[in-house]
């Protein structure tokens, strides 16, 4: 079988390639160049200059062809520009979801099919056949599971996608990499947004959209002015740290008001929600279910999830949770699970 492997330069994707080579498949490595890194520092991100060289070195060790795909224009249009726009408008985007749906498993998958190949990545996730359909399932190692970022994959994508490390624990991945002699077997995990190579997300947004960033007031839910800030793009709903506010009780960001440049803060309870809407919903099965479905809902990657009900509504839906959850941030993904299976997900409104 011919397989195009998306090599990020990290140990996970390199090990995925090593496993496929060991199984005797015709493996081709490809890395994506997503931005101009001429002035970038080395960081713990993916897809940066050093990562491309690490991917090239891994491919050389495995003796497989290696190519670099320049996807800068597509990445800028589908990931970076929406990322900046969301922050300016008071939302908290998830660029990894957009990258997976609109670049990796769209653009790269099309290239794989043109080569008569499957597409493999180093994601910690599994694909199973269940009742005549493909199911996206949690990874064998719950601590490394990345299905939250993959809810946008539909049946056609899952048919041609492989996750070779999906059943492995991280320590086992490193062991396989070491045994294969991969030069990045002990490489640190990526922690940053790959295209934010200097400063943080707030600095990046301020640099890309300086005319849209405004200083403003930090106010209580009662309207009392408590402090000032240099832009709503530096905050997210549910945030506690970095507010710069003194007081006996902790305060959390309740909502962002980009129109008035106000950051509204309150108690943990005020920053919690048990009902919210989602838009741009994608269902793994294809069509939305005909009636409300019970699901465990994750509102961010590290969230354990809360039991709830999802009611489809056209291309969106309504979510009702059994208990209020702090930090249900507009712009973030809400992903719906039935046991270990991903049902779908959407953007929080």
UniProtKB/Swiss-Prot annotation:
Top-level lineage group: Bacteria
Subcellular localization(s) per the UniProt record: Cytoplasm
GO molecular function: ATP binding; tRNA binding; tRNA-uridine 2-sulfurtransferase activity
Paired cysteines (S-S): 99-194
InterPro entries, sorted: MnmA-like, MnmA-like_C, MnmA-like_central, MnmA-like_central_sf, Rossmann-like_a/b/a_fold
EC number(s) on file: 2.8.1.13
Record: residues binding ATP: 6-13, 32, 122
Region (Disordered): 300-320
Region named Interaction with tRNA: 144-146
Marked site positions, Interaction with tRNA: 123, 332
Keyword RNA-binding part of the UniProt annotation: yes
Catalytic activity line of the entry: S-sulfanyl-L-cysteinyl-[protein] + uridine(34) in tRNA + AH2 + ATP = 2-thiouridine(34) in tRNA + L-cysteinyl-[protein] + A + AMP + diphosphate + H(+)
Keyword Membrane: no
Any GO CC annotation of this UniProt entry: cytoplasm
A GO biological process held by the record: tRNA wobble position uridine thiolation
Keyword annotations from UniProtKB, A to Z: ATP-binding, Cytoplasm, Disulfide bond, Nucleotide-binding, RNA-binding, Transferase, tRNA processing, tRNA-binding
Active site feature: 99, 194
Pfam families: tRNA_Me_trans (PF03054), tRNA_Me_trans_C (PF20258), tRNA_Me_trans_M (PF20259)
Function: Catalyzes the 2-thiolation of uridine at the wobble position (U34) of tRNA, leading to the formation of s(2)U34.
Protein family: Belongs to the MnmA/TRMU family.
The protein's name in its UniProt record: tRNA-specific 2-thiouridylase MnmA
Organism, as annotated: Anaeromyxobacter sp. (strain Fw109-5)
Lineage per the UniProt record: Bacteria, Pseudomonadati, Myxococcota, Myxococcia, Myxococcales
